[in-house]
């Protein structure tokens, strides 16, 4: 696989999925957005971030990226764009009222990969609107990792891997959305009582809520980790996610500490560089086999989806915790930002939860394909049972995006 092929392989899986996985960062500023200034900020950031403005082009059943000087206009309104857009891009910017929307096709980048670009656009906007003096560093991505090298290092990953797991039946109804906000301090206190990381406590509480909501004695959950450290690519702007899965037998009266300790032990085991690389080999090995097929994209999609389904990839829920969404972290920038939300399709699970932290509040943005009401209240009940203050638990209705 040459360098050009490696540069698209990191995200090629999102062309094999049944549905487009388009992501959205939703940022509420302290004042109404000035569209003209936002366009200037985008143009200034683009000059320092050419990676995001390459066009994916299909030729002879292969995909490659081409640089483009086509315009990228800021749009008014909250409607999500189709990707690629009319200029061939897979990233878009729009606004409405006080809210700025950053949309992108997951093929281009994961959340941490898009965050430096989003941060720089907001910094340049604040320079123009509020007279701040953010500089903005040129964003250059590390070279793409070589999946063939990783597979050669871990040949056993393709022998006893996901392809032998039992299939979990997921719900695939029209998604609905809900949003939960809770005090971060309360979650941290609960984690201290359990003697584990806050993310482990959060995941344990999600397991308890999902168990009650789905009325299941066993919950299968997935969580994502950033694998840039393991890949030796700290400045990668492309997808670098290693996803892990765990099956958890659970009773209604299971103490939080007991559940959280098990979650935490699993998490710690999987945070090592060796485990992340092995997992990359497992999850991308099937992608590589499909990629190597001399077939059309439509045939590759069918092959991939069948293999992924029987591999046991689907889960009851997945959770992704971005934490501070800005790269680099900037207390000065957040003075001008009131709220931050992350919305991603619940691909590969019945329920998908994206979690971010801002101003001492953790916001959970949930897309739910289970055709029954009550998940927001199930989450509220799980958090409040442990003394964590819930500031909001609201059902937002059908996902029309």
Range-by-range predicted roles:
Residues 1-61, 68-92, 211-401:
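Acyl-thioester-dependent acyl-group transfer interface
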Residues 2-8, 108-189, 383-401:
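Non-catalytic, low-complexity flexible loops and terminal extensions
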Residues 27, 103-106, 176, 190-191, ...:
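Generic anion/oxyanion-binding catalytic loop in active/binding sites
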Residues 31-49, 103-119, 180-215, 364, ...:
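Acyl activation and transfer enzymes in specialized metabolism, enriched
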Residues 84-89, 169-177, 194-196, 201-205:
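Recognition helices and adjacent regulatory flanks at domain boundaries
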Residues 84-128, 139-143, 147-150, 356-375, ...:
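Histidine-centered acyl-transfer/condensation active-site motif
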Residues 98, 187, 287-288:
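Alpha-helical hydrophobic/aromatic positions enriched in membrane-embedded helices and signal peptides
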Residues 121, 125-129, 210, 267, ...:
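Short, well-ordered alpha-helical segments in soluble proteins
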């Amino acid at each position: 696989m040459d360098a050009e092929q490696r540069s698209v392989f990191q995200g090629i899986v999102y062309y094999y999925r049944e549905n487009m996985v388009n992501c959205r960062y939703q940022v509420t500023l302290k004042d109404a957005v000035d569209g003209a200034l936002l366009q200037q900020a985008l143009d200034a950031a683009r000059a320092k971030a050419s990676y995001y403005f390459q066009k994916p082009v299909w030729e002879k059943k292969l995909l490659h990226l081409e640089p483009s000087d086509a315009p990228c206009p800021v749009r008014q309104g909250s409607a999500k764009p189709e990707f690629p857009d009319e200029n061939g891009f897979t990233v878009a910017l729009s606004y409405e009222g006080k809210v700025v929307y950053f949309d992108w096709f997951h093929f281009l980048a994961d959340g941490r990969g898009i965050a430096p670009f989003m941060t720089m656009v907001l910094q340049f906007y604040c320079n123009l609107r509020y007279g701040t003096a953010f500089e903005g560093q040129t964003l250059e991505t590390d070279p793409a990792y070589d999946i063939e090298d990783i597979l050669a290092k871990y040949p056993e990953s393709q022998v006893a891997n996901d392809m032998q797991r039992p299939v979990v039946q997921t719900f695939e109804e029209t998604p609905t959305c809900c949003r939960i906000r809770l005090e971060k301090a309360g979650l941290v206190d609960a984690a201290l009582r359990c003697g584990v990381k806050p993310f482990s406590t959060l995941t344990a509480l999600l397991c308890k809520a999902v168990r009650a909501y789905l009325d299941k004695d066993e919950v299968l959950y997935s969580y994502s980790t950033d694998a840039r450290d393991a890949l030796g690519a700290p400045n990668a702007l492309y997808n670098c996610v290693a996803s892990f899965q765990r099956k958890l037998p659970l009773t209604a009266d299971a103490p939080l500490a007991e559940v959280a300790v098990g979650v935490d032990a699993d998490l710690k085991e999987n945070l090592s560089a060796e485990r992340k690389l092995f997992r990359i080999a497992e999850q991308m090995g099937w992608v590589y086999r499909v990629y190597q097929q001399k077939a059309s994209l439509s045939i590759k999609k069918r092959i991939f989806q069948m293999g992924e389904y029987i591999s046991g990839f689907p889960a009851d829920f997945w959770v992704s915790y971005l934490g501070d969404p800005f790269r680099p972290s900037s207390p000065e920038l957040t003075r001008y930002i009131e709220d931050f939300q992350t919305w991603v399709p619940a691909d590969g699970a019945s329920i998908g939860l994206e979690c971010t932290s801002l101003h001492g509040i953790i916001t959970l943005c949930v897309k739910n394909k289970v055709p029954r009401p009550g998940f927001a209240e199930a989450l509220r009940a799980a958090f409040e049972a442990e003394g964590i203050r819930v500031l909001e638990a609201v059902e937002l209705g059908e996902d029309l995006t």
